[in-house]
Amino acid sequence: QGDIPVIVDPKAECIQWFQPDVIVDAILAKRNLGTKITDAPFVIGVGPGFTAGEDCNCVVETKRGHTLGNVIWDGSAIPNTGVPGNVGGYSIERLIKASADGVIEPKAVIGDLVRKGQIVAITGGEPVYALMDGIVRGMLQPGVQVTKGLKIGDIDARAKQEHCRTISDKARAIGGGVLDAVCSYEKSRGKYALILLAAGQSVRFGSDKLKAVVEGEAMYESA
């Protein structure tokens, strides 16, 4: 019916009974939380923390820049710098971080326009202030337990509400890299051959070079 099934499975126990052909670890924790190259016939790690050939078959780059979305078949993605990419002239200011340990109580929701210095959330009873003007692009749900300094949301200086309901350029590039990797895997499983036809008059092989005998056999014979 075209519906996408979603399973809440923190320990990924469904891998044991579902036995998928492909696993994509897109947790984006900046480190491997337990994914193994033996979990499925083809395992993709997204972002830093994975090494192709060791804990996964390939890695997809997630850092903004020229290599965003690239499929890495040998080695790892660019290490996490802890500094978010520049969007609209802002970097670290884009992040909304918990001001204290405790439960989060959002004061702004995705799509809200906020001003620098505005309270956008309460964490552990302490206010969290926006560090820039813009639109809220991400925010954790109410009641989530957080720790001081944890990223709980982000702000976009471009301030376009439609961006909150569409796939971002970064997400599209990363998704494209995953798709490219899966397609490469599918091709490797099948039996493929490339035939380059170059029939025609030839000084060396005569009127039909595909039928010319080389080392006792015709270069090409139809089935």
Question: What role is predicted for each listed range?
Answer:
Residues 192-223:
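N-terminal glycine-rich phosphate-binding loop and ensuing alpha1 helix
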Residues 1-189:
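Well-ordered secondary-structure scaffolds
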